[in-house]
């Protein structure tokens, strides 16, 4: 009997020890290991760089994107009282500073201010965004043209800060090559968490302080960019003469033109431009419908914000799916199937507008949450292989500037799609109070998504492990080319269609 009791006690002790080790393992995975990782990055890269990444990617881009998207929709609808077709056009205008990102990149690389190439541009970006947001917050009955100017200026501030922190990240990647992947993960993590928090809080904040009050909060977050510029550790650099700066701009243009003469480069670029341009955006029409339509769900501000937060979660799931299961498949195959699913997901809006979901017993909120989650997940899966492909199209010596140019081409496509969606909404007479033809807008939008499927032959049928450019473009350096040190860290950051 004594032996049996000792054996039972020994088994209980072993079971308890196993459970304790399991709990310690979970605690180490969830808390201790991430904290050790963050501490390592701070010690290796300097705290000011770490602070800059959190502010730019997490606060300015992530949190700011979530707050500004919802507040701008309500600002156009409630303060400016414009039609959904107009709002769709103006949303496209706000993105123009992102189209000229290569210009900001060249400025930060070749035009130092007072001997510094990074810190002054953070300060400029912060003041530009802060002043524009404060004007929107404090000014009553602001004229539409001035309001648009402020929104564009705020967008420019975020874009300049984005380009500048990209340069800092790449500089650290050069000096600490073993930490390059860790830095990209840090950037993406900050942006994703910031976006999720921003969208989750946006509806509540718009309800409590109004859309203009949210702009006041965004002005405060923009002020943090000024702090980044003041505390960032940077060594002074030699100022360049005006002639030398002009020569570098001319050399950059010549090198870019030469690169675009390769079919391996211009064909994927043409696909990115056309596929984005024909995928019309009708977000503002849908927003007006599910907030103002008598036959619609009449969602509150809080509900709108929470719906968009599920879109951010869908983007994260899309990233995880691609990174873990799809990244080794050929680019063309992944994009083809993502485009096919995108066509089908477009008709989910039709089911909602025709109220078929209610006949099936599916509540509006549940159905829209699923729609938002699925559409953002598919959009992210479609976009990631194009991002990886773009990184392989950049010739040696000008990777940063050329990558920014490729991203600008995609932004041009999104601008065309936003304006095209506005024209379609206007042509079919979808207004603040009339939504009779919204179903037809959705059908046309969804059918146009078929066009890029017929253009996938422009994408090279290779995977992420393949080399696309000729060897001489990968090994040679541009003798008098652009002194760029900037490779985009946008795998988890870029906005979506």
UniProtKB/Swiss-Prot annotation:
InterPro entries: BT1 (IPR039309), FBT (IPR004324), MFS_trans_sf (IPR036259). It holds the Pfam family BT1. The keyword Transport applies. It is found in: Membrane. The chain crosses the membrane at residues 40-60, 87-107, 120-140, 145-165, 186-206, 212-232, 269-289, 302-322, 334-354, 358-378, 405-425, 439-459. The keyword Cell membrane does not apply. Its main location: membrane. It is a multi-pass membrane protein. One of its GO terms (cellular component) is membrane. Keywords: Membrane, Transmembrane, Transmembrane helix, Transport. Belongs to the major facilitator superfamily. Folate-biopterin transporter (TC 2.A.71) family. PANTHER family: FOLATE-BIOPTERIN TRANSPORTER 1, CHLOROPLASTIC, FOLATE-BIOPTERIN TRANSPORTER 3-RELATED. Could mediate folate transport. This is Probable folate-biopterin transporter 3. It comes from Arabidopsis thaliana.
